[in-house]
């Protein structure tokens, strides 16, 4: 034993791992390779293609179930391909494998049961003729002719049935698989996409087709209340992550056969299913054609959420001003399609996109149509006031304080000067500090668990504001300005539109600090020019106020429901009239009856 090695220090080698660049590596990606490969008639070739497509040797959730089908004393090998967790095992076992492997004796491929039924029918008719032999000769001749026709029809039906089921694929499709949604595919691209969505595929030897069987059964949450767009008076349903559940909600509320739901796949790798929903007899054809064109011409690998799709289909960035309305409420989407708009649903996302959208849509609440017009218009006025306060109040305050002190009453001006006497920082620093602090409290309240989020926001704002005033960092009047601005931002119904106002507020604050009312006026001019230049799917963003004011247009304030006789003309719908001028017919009938 070497004593030196025993006491010798040997440092532990550092383990290092670096990712090497594979940009120029020539690796075949089967998931994005677009081929028109048709299904082989050889079961072994189909099996090898499916295994290579899904990396079967390393994928643990890909299930391939081998079995045999016996038809007309012949044994046909087959296998079922599906993804574990995406399909319903009850459907696969009882309605796919059970009838195929343990088929009923009545489902014979040579259709011998029909022959037996025909023979029984002939025997019954012969017995009846024997019992009625005492009838007149005329009646017997009629019965004989009828019996002859029945036998001929039965024989013809037998021949048609035998001819029909000479094809094994038709026999399996119509006799062996009791499923309400099954199709026959001849190419791999379609069947692979459906398997990824939860279907199962049946491959049978000697057949160059594959049976696409709907067996979806993945878990999903139940229909719940809206999380963001809550209303006191109105429906309490919200969209889910399953696109078919969402389309069924639209179909149930619309209750009309003119509702068209077209499927579109987006993403070369993810192949995310999207649904374009519109009323065929109302929506403008050019709008629908443009929506299809944009959806079908997206060259991306993956699409996960409706927020990503919103960025891809809107006309331009326009400094963050939202151009597509996002909602989680089915009733809001139904009202949109009834006006002539289109709704886009994305699989895996509980939010729908409404196109086109104008500025007034982002200031509207789902509750407006459910309230009395007087109350609804009062709330809409409050939202309009909150819009102006959120955008301009901090900038107006800093402009008046620095440049236009004469606008303040003398007593109020003295109070502001006394409050700011001990503050060592310029007013722009105070304002930006409190604005950023308020945004931090807001984001912290959103990201923390809901049980303590609201408490954190209230306590944090109180402690921070009181400590800032006590330390002479900010003045009390500034705390009031920031608080009113923050409360006004919460009144905006749409989160995206409210966020854009919060960002633009900083720009108006800086302009007010630099040039006072002149800077704010210049900012308003640029902001209005920007709004006027925006279009959402060919519709002016400031419609119905600009560029054309029409008598048919529904303005910002909501008229009574019985006065909403026309749809928005800026949408150019096929059907302009939405209801009769005398929608309350009962009033007219009662008045006529009284006059008589």
Language model region names:
Residues 396-399, 409-596:
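Generic detector of multi-pass transmembrane helix bundles and their immediately adjacent loops
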Residues 373, 377, 404, 408, ...:
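Short, contiguous, pocket-lining structural segments
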Residues 387-407:
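Hydrophobic alpha-helical segments embedded in or immediately adjacent to the lipid bilayer
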């Amino acid at each position: 034993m070497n004593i030196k090695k025993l006491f010798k220090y040997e440092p532990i080698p550092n383990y290092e791992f670096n990712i090497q660049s594979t940009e120029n590596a020539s690796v075949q990606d089967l998931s994005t390779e677009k081929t028109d490969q048709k299904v082989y008639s050889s079961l072994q070739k189909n099996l090898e293609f499916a295994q290579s497509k899904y990396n079967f040797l390393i994928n643990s959730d890909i299930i391939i179930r081998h079995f045999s089908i016996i038809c007309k004393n012949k044994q046909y090998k087959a296998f079922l391909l599906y993804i574990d967790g995406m399909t319903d095992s009850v459907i696969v076992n009882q309605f796919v494998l059970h009838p195929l492997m343990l088929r009923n004796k009545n489902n014979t491929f040579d259709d011998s049961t029909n022959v037996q039924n025909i023979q029984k029918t002939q025997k019954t008719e012969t017995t009846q003729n024997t019992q009625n032999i005492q009838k007149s000769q005329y009646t017997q001749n009629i019965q004989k002719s009828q019996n002859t026709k029945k036998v001929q029809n039965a024989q013809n039906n037998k021949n048609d049935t035998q001819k029909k089921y000479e094809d094994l694929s038709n026999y399996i499709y119509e006799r062996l698989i009791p499923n309400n949604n099954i199709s026959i595919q001849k190419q791999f691209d379609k069947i692979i996409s459906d398997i990824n969505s939860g279907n199962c595929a049946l491959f049978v030897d000697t057949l160059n087709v594959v049976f696409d069987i709907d067996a979806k059964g993945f878990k999903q949450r139940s229909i719940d209340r809206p999380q963001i767009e809550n209303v006191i008076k109105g429906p309490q349903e919200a969209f889910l992550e399953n696109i078919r559940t969402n389309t069924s909600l639209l179909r149930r509320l619309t209750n009309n056969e003119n509702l068209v739901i077209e499927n579109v796949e987006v993403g070369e790798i993810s192949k995310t299913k999207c649904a374009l929903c519109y009323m065929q007899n109302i929506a403008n054809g050019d709008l629908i054609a443009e929506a299809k064109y944009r959806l079908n011409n997206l060259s991306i690998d993956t699409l996960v959420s409706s927020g990503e799709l919103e960025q891809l289909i809107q006309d331009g960035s326009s400094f963050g001003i939202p151009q597509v309305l996002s909602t989680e409420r089915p009733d809001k989407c139904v009202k949109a399609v009834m006006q002539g708009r289109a709704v886009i649903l994305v699989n895996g996302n509980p939010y729908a996109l409404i196109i086109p959208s104008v500025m007034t849509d982002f200031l509207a609440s789902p509750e407006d149509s459910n309230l009395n017009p007087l109350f609804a218009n009062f709330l809409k006025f409050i939202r309009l006031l909150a819009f102006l306060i959120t955008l301009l109040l901090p900038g107006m305050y800093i402009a008046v304080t620095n440049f236009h002190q004469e606008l303040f009453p003398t007593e109020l001006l003295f109070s502001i000067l006394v409050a700011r006497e001990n503050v060592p920082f310029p007013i722009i620093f105070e304002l930006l500090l409190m604005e950023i602090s308020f945004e931090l409290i807001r984001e912290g309240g959103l990201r923390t668990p809901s049980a303590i989020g609201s408490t954190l926001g209230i306590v944090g704002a109180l402690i921070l504001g009181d400590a800032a005033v006590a330390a002479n960092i900010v003045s009390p009047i500034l705390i009031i300005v920031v608080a009113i601005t923050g409360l006004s931002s919460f009144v905006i119904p749409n989160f995206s539109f409210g966020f854009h106002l919060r960002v633009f507020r900083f720009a108006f604050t800086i302009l007010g600090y630099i040039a006072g009312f002149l800077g704010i006026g210049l900012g308003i001019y640029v902001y209005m020019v920007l709004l006027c230049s925006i279009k959402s799917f060919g519709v002016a963003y400031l419609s119905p106020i600009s560029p054309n004011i029409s008598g048919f247009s529904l303005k910002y304030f909501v008229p009574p429901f019985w006065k909403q006789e026309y749809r928005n003309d800026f949408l150019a719908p096929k059907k302009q009239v939405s209801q009769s001028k005398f929608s309350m017919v009962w009033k007219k009938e009662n008045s006529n009856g009284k006059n008589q």
